[in-house]
Amino acid sequence: MAPGSTMWLLGYIFLCFPVSFALIKQPKPETPTDPGVLHCRPWNFKFTINFQNQETGSSPVLVTWDNQGRLHRLQNDTDCGTRVGEGPGPSVVLEANYSSCYVTESEPYYVMLVGVEEVDAAGQNLVTKQQLLKCPMHLPAPDAGLCDSVPVQDRLPCATAPISQEDCEELGCCHSSEEVNACYYGNTVTSHCTQEGHFSIAVSRNVSSPPLHLDSVHLVFGNDSECQPVVATRAFVLFLFPFTACGTTRQITGDRAIYENELLATREVRTWSRGSITRDSIFRLRVSCSYSISSSALPVDMHVLTLPPPLPETQPGPLTVVLQIAKDKDYHSYYTMDDYPVVKLLRDPIYVDVSILYRTDPYLGLRLHQCWATPRTNPLYQPQWPILVKGCPYTGDNYQTQLIPVQEAFDLPFPSHHQRFSISTFSFLDSSVAKEALKGPIYLHCSVSVCQPTGTQSCTVTCPIDSRRRNSDINFQNSTANISSKGPMILLQATEDPSEKLHKHSGVPVHPGALWVAGLSGIFIIGALLVSYVAIRTRR
Protein backbone atom coordinates (compact mmCIF):
# COMPACT_ATOMS: atom_id res chain seq x y z
CA MET A 1 0.00 0.00 0.00
CA ALA A 2 1.42 3.38 -0.96
CA PRO A 3 2.34 5.85 1.82
CA GLY A 4 -0.07 8.73 2.27
CA SER A 5 -3.16 6.71 1.43
CA THR A 6 -5.73 5.66 3.97
CA MET A 7 -5.35 2.05 5.02
CA TRP A 8 -8.76 0.54 5.68
CA LEU A 9 -7.35 -2.29 7.75
CA LEU A 10 -9.87 -2.64 10.50
CA GLY A 11 -13.59 -2.43 10.62
CA TYR A 12 -15.83 -2.81 13.61
CA ILE A 13 -14.89 -3.20 17.24
CA PHE A 14 -17.58 -4.40 19.58
CA LEU A 15 -17.52 -4.08 23.33
CA CYS A 16 -20.29 -5.12 25.67
CA PHE A 17 -21.53 -2.81 27.99
CA PRO A 18 -5.81 28.28 24.54
CA VAL A 19 -3.89 31.26 25.19
CA SER A 20 -6.88 33.12 26.60
CA PHE A 21 -6.80 36.63 28.00
CA ALA A 22 -9.56 38.21 30.04
CA LEU A 23 -11.22 41.29 28.59
CA ILE A 24 -9.98 44.52 30.06
CA LYS A 25 -12.64 47.17 30.59
CA GLN A 26 -10.96 49.91 28.59
CA PRO A 27 -10.71 50.95 24.92
CA LYS A 28 -9.45 48.15 22.70
CA PRO A 29 -5.65 48.48 22.38
CA GLU A 30 -4.20 49.00 18.92
CA THR A 31 -1.38 47.09 17.33
CA PRO A 32 1.64 49.40 17.49
CA THR A 33 2.85 50.96 14.25
CA ASP A 34 6.34 49.92 15.32
CA PRO A 35 5.92 46.30 16.46
CA GLY A 36 9.44 46.17 17.84
CA VAL A 37 12.08 43.51 17.36
CA LEU A 38 11.74 40.05 18.85
CA HIS A 39 14.62 37.61 19.29
CA CYS A 40 13.73 34.04 20.23
CA ARG A 41 16.54 32.78 22.39
CA PRO A 42 16.92 29.19 23.60
CA TRP A 43 15.81 30.24 27.08
CA ASN A 44 13.83 33.50 26.79
CA PHE A 45 12.16 36.27 24.78
CA LYS A 46 14.21 39.37 24.02
CA PHE A 47 11.89 42.16 22.87
CA THR A 48 13.13 45.63 21.91
CA ILE A 49 10.65 48.44 21.27
CA ASN A 50 10.88 52.17 20.69
CA PHE A 51 7.78 53.58 22.39
CA GLN A 52 8.71 57.04 23.67
CA ASN A 53 5.58 59.20 23.81
CA GLN A 54 6.50 62.31 21.84
CA GLU A 55 3.17 64.08 22.52
CA THR A 56 3.03 64.12 26.30
CA GLY A 57 6.67 63.49 27.07
CA SER A 58 5.65 60.89 29.63
CA SER A 59 7.35 57.52 29.88
CA PRO A 60 5.05 54.69 28.81
CA VAL A 61 5.25 51.45 30.73
CA LEU A 62 5.32 47.88 29.43
CA VAL A 63 2.53 45.76 30.88
CA THR A 64 1.32 42.19 30.54
CA TRP A 65 -1.51 39.94 31.68
CA ASP A 66 -1.44 36.74 33.72
CA ASN A 67 -3.56 33.70 32.89
CA GLN A 68 -6.40 35.13 35.01
CA GLY A 69 -6.53 38.29 32.91
CA ARG A 70 -5.02 40.53 35.61
CA LEU A 71 -2.86 43.43 34.45
CA HIS A 72 0.77 43.64 35.67
CA ARG A 73 3.44 46.27 35.07
CA LEU A 74 6.62 44.64 33.86
CA GLN A 75 9.75 45.22 35.90
CA ASN A 76 12.85 43.40 37.07
CA ASP A 77 11.35 40.41 38.85
CA THR A 78 13.55 37.41 39.61
CA ASP A 79 10.64 35.31 40.86
CA CYS A 80 8.67 35.80 37.64
CA GLY A 81 11.69 35.74 35.33
CA THR A 82 11.35 39.20 33.78
CA ARG A 83 13.92 41.95 33.20
CA VAL A 84 13.31 45.43 31.79
CA GLY A 85 16.13 47.78 30.82
CA GLU A 86 17.12 50.60 28.51
CA GLY A 87 18.09 49.78 24.95
CA PRO A 88 19.89 51.82 22.30
CA GLY A 89 18.47 55.33 21.95
CA PRO A 90 14.90 55.79 23.21
CA SER A 91 14.15 52.04 23.21
CA VAL A 92 13.34 49.60 26.00
CA VAL A 93 14.44 45.97 26.14
CA LEU A 94 12.27 43.29 27.75
CA GLU A 95 13.63 39.84 28.56
CA ALA A 96 11.22 37.16 29.79
CA ASN A 97 12.13 33.58 30.53
CA TYR A 98 9.95 30.91 28.94
CA SER A 99 9.19 29.77 32.50
CA SER A 100 7.96 33.27 33.43
CA CYS A 101 4.69 33.81 35.29
CA TYR A 102 3.29 35.56 32.21
CA VAL A 103 4.36 33.14 29.46
CA THR A 104 1.93 30.50 28.26
CA GLU A 105 2.79 27.28 26.46
CA SER A 106 0.62 26.96 23.37
CA GLU A 107 2.12 24.05 21.45
CA PRO A 108 4.33 24.52 19.50
CA TYR A 109 4.96 28.08 20.76
CA TYR A 110 5.69 30.09 23.88
CA VAL A 111 3.42 33.14 23.82
CA MET A 112 3.21 36.31 25.87
CA LEU A 113 0.93 39.32 25.40
CA VAL A 114 2.68 42.65 26.02
CA GLY A 115 1.01 46.06 26.14
CA VAL A 116 2.04 49.70 26.37
CA GLU A 117 0.38 51.70 29.13
CA GLU A 118 0.26 55.48 28.68
CA VAL A 119 -1.38 58.46 30.35
CA ASP A 120 -4.12 60.12 28.31
CA ALA A 121 -5.05 63.81 28.26
CA ALA A 122 -7.36 63.30 31.25
CA GLY A 123 -4.56 61.78 33.31
CA GLN A 124 -5.96 58.24 33.10
CA ASN A 125 -3.71 55.21 32.61
CA LEU A 126 -4.75 53.33 29.48
CA VAL A 127 -3.27 50.40 27.58
CA THR A 128 -2.99 51.94 24.12
CA LYS A 129 -1.01 49.28 22.25
CA GLN A 130 -0.44 45.56 22.50
CA GLN A 131 1.82 43.00 20.84
CA LEU A 132 1.70 39.19 20.96
CA LEU A 133 5.17 37.72 21.36
CA LYS A 134 5.52 34.20 19.97
CA CYS A 135 8.60 31.98 19.93
CA PRO A 136 8.85 28.31 18.92
CA MET A 137 9.15 25.91 21.83
CA HIS A 138 11.85 23.94 20.05
CA LEU A 139 14.50 26.25 18.65
CA PRO A 140 17.03 24.83 16.20
CA ALA A 141 19.90 25.66 18.57
CA PRO A 142 22.68 23.06 18.64
CA ASP A 143 22.73 20.75 21.61
CA ALA A 144 25.91 19.54 23.27
CA GLY A 145 26.17 16.55 20.93
CA LEU A 146 26.06 18.71 17.81
CA CYS A 147 28.78 20.94 19.24
CA ASP A 148 31.14 18.38 20.77
CA SER A 149 31.05 16.23 17.63
CA VAL A 150 32.82 18.92 15.57
CA PRO A 151 36.59 18.25 15.60
CA VAL A 152 38.68 21.23 16.62
CA GLN A 153 40.44 21.37 13.25
CA ASP A 154 37.05 21.49 11.44
CA ARG A 155 35.47 24.26 13.51
CA LEU A 156 34.28 27.16 11.37
CA PRO A 157 34.02 30.52 13.21
CA CYS A 158 30.47 31.79 13.57
CA ALA A 159 31.42 35.24 14.91
CA THR A 160 34.56 37.21 15.53
CA ALA A 161 36.06 37.24 19.00
CA PRO A 162 35.52 38.43 21.60
CA ILE A 163 31.89 37.33 21.96
CA SER A 164 29.93 36.22 25.00
CA GLN A 165 28.37 32.78 25.26
CA GLU A 166 24.90 34.36 25.38
CA ASP A 167 25.40 36.30 22.14
CA CYS A 168 26.97 33.28 20.45
CA GLU A 169 24.08 30.98 21.34
CA GLU A 170 21.63 33.66 20.22
CA LEU A 171 23.09 33.15 16.73
CA GLY A 172 22.40 29.42 17.04
CA CYS A 173 26.10 28.60 17.33
CA CYS A 174 28.30 26.64 19.74
CA HIS A 175 30.53 28.27 22.34
CA SER A 176 33.74 27.03 23.92
CA SER A 177 35.83 29.22 26.18
CA GLU A 178 38.83 26.87 25.81
CA GLU A 179 39.33 27.23 22.05
CA VAL A 180 40.63 30.03 19.85
CA ASN A 181 37.44 29.88 17.80
CA ALA A 182 35.21 30.37 20.82
CA CYS A 183 32.03 30.71 18.72
CA TYR A 184 31.69 28.11 15.96
CA TYR A 185 29.05 26.31 13.89
CA GLY A 186 27.64 22.98 15.05
CA ASN A 187 26.95 19.86 13.02
CA THR A 188 23.61 21.13 11.73
CA VAL A 189 22.16 23.89 9.54
CA THR A 190 22.68 27.31 11.15
CA SER A 191 20.84 30.24 9.60
CA HIS A 192 20.17 33.83 10.57
CA CYS A 193 19.26 37.15 8.99
CA THR A 194 21.72 40.01 9.23
CA GLN A 195 20.87 43.63 9.95
CA GLU A 196 22.37 44.56 6.58
CA GLY A 197 19.77 42.45 4.74
CA HIS A 198 21.67 39.23 4.06
CA PHE A 199 21.02 35.54 4.50
CA SER A 200 23.73 33.70 6.43
CA ILE A 201 23.44 29.91 6.04
CA ALA A 202 26.03 27.40 7.25
CA VAL A 203 25.59 23.72 6.34
CA SER A 204 27.51 20.87 7.96
CA ARG A 205 28.30 17.79 5.90
CA ASN A 206 27.04 15.72 8.83
CA VAL A 207 23.56 17.26 8.77
CA SER A 208 22.40 14.12 6.96
CA SER A 209 23.30 10.47 6.95
CA PRO A 210 25.17 9.52 4.85
CA PRO A 211 27.11 12.82 4.90
CA LEU A 212 26.48 15.41 2.20
CA HIS A 213 28.78 16.11 -0.71
CA LEU A 214 29.18 19.78 0.12
CA ASP A 215 30.32 20.66 -3.40
CA SER A 216 26.83 19.67 -4.60
CA VAL A 217 25.00 22.10 -2.27
CA HIS A 218 23.79 25.17 -4.15
CA LEU A 219 21.05 27.80 -4.29
CA VAL A 220 18.21 26.60 -6.50
CA PHE A 221 17.85 29.83 -8.50
CA GLY A 222 21.27 31.43 -8.09
CA ASN A 223 24.14 30.96 -10.53
CA ASP A 224 25.96 34.29 -10.12
CA SER A 225 29.29 34.55 -8.39
CA GLU A 226 27.75 36.20 -5.33
CA CYS A 227 25.52 33.14 -4.93
CA GLN A 228 28.45 30.77 -4.48
CA PRO A 229 29.64 29.79 -0.98
CA VAL A 230 31.87 32.39 0.65
CA VAL A 231 33.58 29.66 2.68
CA ALA A 232 33.92 25.98 1.77
CA THR A 233 35.86 23.48 3.85
CA ARG A 234 35.78 19.71 4.03
CA ALA A 235 33.25 19.95 6.92
CA PHE A 236 31.19 23.11 6.25
CA VAL A 237 29.90 25.35 3.51
CA LEU A 238 28.80 28.93 4.25
CA PHE A 239 26.50 31.04 2.07
CA LEU A 240 26.19 34.81 2.56
CA PHE A 241 24.09 36.67 0.00
CA PRO A 242 21.74 39.69 -0.11
CA PHE A 243 17.97 39.53 -0.29
CA THR A 244 18.06 41.26 -3.67
CA ALA A 245 20.00 38.46 -5.40
CA CYS A 246 20.15 34.72 -6.05
CA GLY A 247 16.47 34.29 -6.85
CA THR A 248 15.25 35.41 -3.43
CA THR A 249 11.49 35.97 -3.41
CA ARG A 250 9.78 38.80 -1.52
CA GLN A 251 6.24 38.79 -0.18
CA ILE A 252 4.46 41.57 1.74
CA THR A 253 2.11 40.41 4.50
CA GLY A 254 0.65 43.24 6.54
CA ASP A 255 3.53 45.16 8.09
CA ARG A 256 6.07 42.45 7.28
CA ALA A 257 8.28 41.71 4.31
CA ILE A 258 9.15 38.02 4.02
CA TYR A 259 12.19 36.95 1.98
CA GLU A 260 12.65 33.30 1.00
CA ASN A 261 15.23 31.20 -0.77
CA GLU A 262 16.05 27.54 -1.17
CA LEU A 263 19.13 25.32 -0.99
CA LEU A 264 19.46 21.98 -2.73
CA ALA A 265 22.05 19.20 -2.80
CA THR A 266 22.42 17.40 -6.11
CA ARG A 267 22.49 13.62 -5.86
CA GLU A 268 24.97 11.48 -7.73
CA VAL A 269 23.02 8.97 -9.81
CA ARG A 270 24.46 5.82 -11.41
CA THR A 271 22.55 4.42 -14.37
CA TRP A 272 22.81 1.32 -16.50
CA SER A 273 20.51 -0.46 -18.93
CA ARG A 274 18.37 -2.01 -16.19
CA GLY A 275 18.00 0.80 -13.69
CA SER A 276 19.50 3.65 -11.70
CA ILE A 277 20.79 3.98 -8.15
CA THR A 278 22.03 6.68 -5.78
CA ARG A 279 23.78 6.57 -2.44
CA ASP A 280 23.24 10.21 -1.56
CA SER A 281 20.77 11.67 0.92
CA ILE A 282 17.93 13.97 -0.12
CA PHE A 283 18.70 17.50 1.05
CA ARG A 284 16.40 20.43 0.33
CA LEU A 285 16.25 23.45 2.61
CA ARG A 286 13.97 26.49 2.48
CA VAL A 287 14.85 29.54 4.58
CA SER A 288 12.90 32.72 5.20
CA CYS A 289 13.57 36.04 6.91
CA SER A 290 10.82 38.35 8.13
CA TYR A 291 11.36 42.11 8.55
CA SER A 292 9.13 44.90 9.78
CA ILE A 293 8.56 47.46 7.03
CA SER A 294 7.72 50.42 9.26
CA SER A 295 10.55 49.96 11.77
CA SER A 296 14.30 49.62 11.52
CA ALA A 297 16.00 47.00 9.37
CA LEU A 298 16.38 44.53 12.20
CA PRO A 299 14.98 41.07 11.40
CA VAL A 300 11.83 40.04 13.23
CA ASP A 301 12.32 36.29 12.96
CA MET A 302 13.98 33.52 10.99
CA HIS A 303 12.55 30.19 9.83
CA VAL A 304 14.36 27.14 8.50
CA LEU A 305 11.96 24.77 6.78
CA THR A 306 13.50 21.40 5.99
CA LEU A 307 11.88 18.53 4.19
CA PRO A 308 9.97 16.14 6.45
CA PRO A 309 11.62 12.75 6.95
CA PRO A 310 10.56 10.12 4.40
CA LEU A 311 7.58 7.97 5.30
CA PRO A 312 8.43 4.47 6.54
CA GLU A 313 8.07 1.58 4.15
CA THR A 314 4.68 -0.11 4.46
CA GLN A 315 3.78 -3.73 4.01
CA PRO A 316 0.77 -5.95 4.75
CA GLY A 317 0.54 -7.42 8.23
CA PRO A 318 -1.69 -7.89 11.26
CA LEU A 319 -2.80 -4.83 13.17
CA THR A 320 -4.65 -4.90 16.48
CA VAL A 321 -7.14 -2.28 17.62
CA VAL A 322 -8.84 -2.50 21.01
CA LEU A 323 -11.71 -0.66 22.65
CA GLN A 324 -11.45 -0.23 26.42
CA ILE A 325 -13.50 1.38 29.16
CA ALA A 326 -11.57 3.51 31.64
CA LYS A 327 -12.33 3.51 35.36
CA ASP A 328 -11.91 7.29 35.66
CA LYS A 329 -11.88 10.41 33.51
CA ASP A 330 -8.08 10.57 33.61
CA TYR A 331 -7.75 7.14 31.99
CA HIS A 332 -5.38 5.92 34.68
CA SER A 333 -6.72 2.34 34.58
CA TYR A 334 -9.17 0.23 32.61
CA TYR A 335 -11.74 -2.45 33.37
CA THR A 336 -10.45 -5.96 32.73
CA MET A 337 -12.41 -9.05 31.77
CA ASP A 338 -12.72 -10.00 35.45
CA ASP A 339 -14.42 -6.67 36.26
CA TYR A 340 -17.47 -7.28 34.09
CA PRO A 341 -20.39 -6.94 34.18
CA VAL A 342 -19.95 -3.32 35.19
CA VAL A 343 -23.07 -1.80 36.72
CA LYS A 344 -23.82 1.81 35.82
CA LEU A 345 -26.64 4.15 36.82
CA LEU A 346 -28.45 6.19 34.22
CA ARG A 347 -26.49 9.31 33.15
CA ASP A 348 -23.26 7.95 34.62
CA PRO A 349 -20.31 8.78 32.34
CA ILE A 350 -18.53 6.03 30.44
CA TYR A 351 -14.99 6.86 29.31
CA VAL A 352 -14.04 5.05 26.10
CA ASP A 353 -10.58 4.57 24.60
CA VAL A 354 -9.99 3.08 21.14
CA SER A 355 -6.32 2.43 20.43
CA ILE A 356 -3.82 0.67 18.18
CA LEU A 357 -1.77 -1.96 19.99
CA TYR A 358 1.82 -3.12 19.55
CA ARG A 359 2.87 -0.42 17.08
CA THR A 360 5.56 2.27 17.45
CA ASP A 361 5.14 4.03 14.10
CA PRO A 362 4.44 7.72 14.91
CA TYR A 363 2.97 8.24 11.42
CA LEU A 364 0.04 5.91 12.03
CA GLY A 365 -3.27 7.55 12.85
CA LEU A 366 -6.57 6.17 14.12
CA ARG A 367 -9.88 7.51 12.84
CA LEU A 368 -13.34 6.81 14.24
CA HIS A 369 -16.13 6.83 11.67
CA GLN A 370 -19.35 5.64 13.33
CA CYS A 371 -20.07 4.58 16.89
CA TRP A 372 -23.48 3.34 18.02
CA ALA A 373 -25.20 1.23 20.65
CA THR A 374 -27.60 -1.73 20.48
CA PRO A 375 -29.26 -3.93 23.13
CA ARG A 376 -27.71 -7.05 21.53
CA THR A 377 -24.26 -8.14 20.37
CA ASN A 378 -25.36 -7.96 16.74
CA PRO A 379 -24.32 -4.53 15.40
CA LEU A 380 -27.26 -4.58 12.96
CA TYR A 381 -29.82 -5.27 15.68
CA GLN A 382 -32.67 -2.81 16.14
CA PRO A 383 -33.15 -0.48 17.97
CA GLN A 384 -29.92 1.46 17.61
CA TRP A 385 -28.68 4.75 19.01
CA PRO A 386 -25.93 6.77 17.26
CA ILE A 387 -23.04 8.02 19.39
CA LEU A 388 -20.60 9.29 16.76
CA VAL A 389 -21.62 10.12 13.20
CA LYS A 390 -18.77 10.57 10.72
CA GLY A 391 -16.44 10.98 13.67
CA CYS A 392 -18.48 13.74 15.35
CA PRO A 393 -20.92 13.63 18.30
CA TYR A 394 -24.51 12.89 17.30
CA THR A 395 -26.35 16.22 17.55
CA GLY A 396 -29.77 14.69 18.21
CA ASP A 397 -28.79 13.63 21.74
CA ASN A 398 -29.43 16.03 24.61
CA TYR A 399 -26.44 14.45 26.39
CA GLN A 400 -23.97 14.74 23.54
CA THR A 401 -20.88 12.57 23.33
CA GLN A 402 -17.76 14.43 24.45
CA LEU A 403 -14.62 14.03 22.35
CA ILE A 404 -11.54 13.95 24.59
CA PRO A 405 -8.21 15.25 23.20
CA VAL A 406 -5.28 12.89 23.65
CA GLN A 407 -2.00 14.48 24.73
CA GLU A 408 1.45 12.94 24.60
CA ALA A 409 2.58 11.63 27.99
CA PHE A 410 5.19 9.32 29.49
CA ASP A 411 2.79 6.36 29.35
CA LEU A 412 1.23 7.54 26.06
CA PRO A 413 4.10 8.19 23.61
CA PHE A 414 1.92 7.93 20.48
CA PRO A 415 -1.25 10.01 20.97
CA SER A 416 -2.23 9.53 17.31
CA HIS A 417 -2.75 5.83 18.11
CA HIS A 418 -5.66 6.70 20.44
CA GLN A 419 -9.16 8.15 20.12
CA ARG A 420 -11.17 8.92 23.27
CA PHE A 421 -14.69 10.03 24.07
CA SER A 422 -17.22 9.86 26.89
CA ILE A 423 -20.93 9.08 26.81
CA SER A 424 -23.75 9.29 29.35
CA THR A 425 -25.33 5.95 30.20
CA PHE A 426 -28.84 5.45 28.87
CA SER A 427 -31.49 2.76 28.53
CA PHE A 428 -33.31 1.63 25.41
CA LEU A 429 -37.12 1.76 25.35
CA ASP A 430 -39.35 -0.93 23.89
CA SER A 431 -41.55 -0.29 20.88
CA SER A 432 -44.82 -0.42 22.84
CA VAL A 433 -47.03 2.57 23.53
CA ALA A 434 -45.95 2.53 27.18
CA LYS A 435 -42.28 2.87 26.14
CA GLU A 436 -40.99 0.73 28.98
CA ALA A 437 -37.26 0.73 29.64
CA LEU A 438 -35.45 -2.37 28.39
CA LYS A 439 -33.49 -3.81 31.27
CA GLY A 440 -30.27 -5.51 30.34
CA PRO A 441 -26.95 -4.89 28.65
CA ILE A 442 -25.99 -2.21 26.21
CA TYR A 443 -23.51 -3.06 23.48
CA LEU A 444 -21.22 -0.46 21.95
CA HIS A 445 -19.99 -0.71 18.35
CA CYS A 446 -17.48 1.41 16.43
CA SER A 447 -16.19 1.40 12.88
CA VAL A 448 -12.60 2.59 12.62
CA SER A 449 -9.80 2.87 10.11
CA VAL A 450 -6.06 3.11 10.49
CA CYS A 451 -4.61 5.82 8.26
CA GLN A 452 -1.26 7.23 7.29
CA PRO A 453 0.26 9.69 7.73
CA THR A 454 -1.30 11.13 10.86
CA GLY A 455 -2.35 14.79 10.67
CA THR A 456 -3.37 14.68 7.01
CA GLN A 457 -6.93 15.18 5.78
CA SER A 458 -7.48 11.43 5.58
CA CYS A 459 -6.59 11.12 9.27
CA THR A 460 -8.46 14.08 10.78
CA VAL A 461 -12.08 14.96 11.44
CA THR A 462 -13.32 18.52 11.93
CA CYS A 463 -16.48 18.93 14.01
CA PRO A 464 -19.20 19.99 13.65
CA ILE A 465 -19.58 18.34 10.27
CA ASP A 466 -21.44 20.04 7.44
CA SER A 467 -25.16 20.03 8.18
CA ARG A 468 -25.82 18.94 4.61
CA ARG A 469 -23.70 15.85 5.20
CA ARG A 470 -24.95 15.10 8.69
CA ASN A 471 -26.82 11.80 8.83
CA SER A 472 -27.53 9.61 11.81
CA ASP A 473 -27.84 6.44 9.74
CA ILE A 474 -25.10 3.88 10.22
CA ASN A 475 -23.42 3.33 6.86
CA PHE A 476 -21.10 0.39 6.26
CA GLN A 477 -18.39 0.94 3.70
CA ASN A 478 -17.73 -1.90 1.33
CA SER A 479 -13.97 -1.43 1.52
CA THR A 480 -13.96 -1.90 5.30
CA ALA A 481 -13.30 -5.33 6.77
CA ASN A 482 -15.68 -6.41 9.53
CA ILE A 483 -14.43 -7.86 12.78
CA SER A 484 -16.21 -8.24 16.11
CA SER A 485 -15.20 -8.94 19.66
CA LYS A 486 -17.71 -10.50 22.06
CA GLY A 487 -16.68 -8.70 25.17
CA PRO A 488 -18.25 -8.39 28.61
CA MET A 489 -21.41 -6.36 29.00
CA ILE A 490 -22.25 -3.16 30.82
CA LEU A 491 -25.49 -3.57 32.77
CA LEU A 492 -27.60 -0.48 33.17
CA GLN A 493 -29.28 -0.28 36.58
CA ALA A 494 -32.88 0.85 35.99
CA THR A 495 -34.38 3.70 37.99
CA GLU A 496 -36.87 2.75 40.72
CA ASP A 497 -40.58 2.60 39.97
CA PRO A 498 -42.65 4.97 42.21
CA SER A 499 -44.68 2.06 43.60
CA GLU A 500 -41.46 0.22 44.41
CA LYS A 501 -40.11 3.32 46.13
CA LEU A 502 -43.32 3.60 48.26
CA HIS A 503 -43.06 -0.06 49.16
CA LYS A 504 -39.38 0.38 49.98
CA HIS A 505 -40.06 3.11 52.56
CA SER A 506 -43.25 1.61 54.10
CA GLY A 507 -41.38 -0.44 56.71
CA VAL A 508 -40.57 -4.12 57.29
CA PRO A 509 -42.96 -6.59 55.53
CA VAL A 510 -45.60 -8.17 57.91
CA HIS A 511 -46.60 -11.85 57.73
CA PRO A 512 -50.39 -12.40 57.08
CA GLY A 513 -50.70 -14.67 60.17
CA ALA A 514 -49.43 -11.90 62.35
CA LEU A 515 -52.22 -9.66 61.10
CA TRP A 516 -54.87 -12.24 62.27
CA VAL A 517 -53.28 -12.46 65.70
CA ALA A 518 -53.18 -8.69 66.00
CA GLY A 519 -56.85 -8.45 65.01
CA LEU A 520 -58.06 -11.06 67.54
CA SER A 521 -55.98 -9.46 70.27
CA GLY A 522 -57.63 -6.13 69.56
CA ILE A 523 -61.13 -7.69 69.80
CA PHE A 524 -60.31 -9.30 73.17
CA ILE A 525 -58.95 -6.04 74.55
CA ILE A 526 -62.02 -4.07 73.44
CA GLY A 527 -64.33 -6.75 74.93
CA ALA A 528 -62.51 -6.69 78.26
CA LEU A 529 -62.83 -2.92 78.43
CA LEU A 530 -66.61 -3.13 77.77
CA VAL A 531 -67.12 -5.78 80.51
CA SER A 532 -65.16 -3.66 83.00
CA TYR A 533 -67.23 -0.59 82.11
CA VAL A 534 -70.56 -2.48 82.59
CA ALA A 535 -69.42 -3.86 85.96
CA ILE A 536 -68.52 -0.41 87.23
CA ARG A 537 -71.94 0.98 86.17
CA THR A 538 -73.78 -1.91 87.92
CA ARG A 539 -72.01 -1.25 91.27
CA ARG A 540 -73.15 2.33 91.18
From Swiss-Prot:
Keywords: Cell membrane, Cleavage on pair of basic residues, Disulfide bond, Extracellular matrix, Fertilization, Glycoprotein, Membrane, Receptor, Secreted, Signal, Transmembrane, Transmembrane helix. Residues 192-470 form the ZP domain. Residues 145-187 form the P-type domain. It is a single-pass type I membrane protein. It holds the Pfam family ZP-N. It is found in: Cell membrane. GO terms for molecular function: acrosin binding; identical protein binding; structural constituent of egg coat. Glycans are attached at N76, N97, N206, N223, S296, T306, N478, N482. Disulfide bonds join C371-C446. The chain crosses the membrane at residues 516-536. The keyword Glycoprotein applies. Proteolytically cleaved before the transmembrane segment to yield the secreted ectodomain incorporated in the zona pellucida. Residues 1-24 form the signal peptide. Residues 467-540 form a propeptide. Residues 25-515 are extracellular. The ZP domain is involved in the polymerization of the ZP proteins to form the zona pellucida. Component of the zona pellucida, an extracellular matrix surrounding oocytes which mediates sperm binding, induction of the acrosome reaction and prevents post-fertilization polyspermy. The zona pellucida is composed of 3 to 4 glycoproteins, ZP1, ZP2, ZP3, and ZP4. ZP4 may act as a sperm receptor. This is Zona pellucida sperm-binding protein 4. The lineage of its organism: Eukaryota, Metazoa, Chordata, Craniata, Vertebrata.
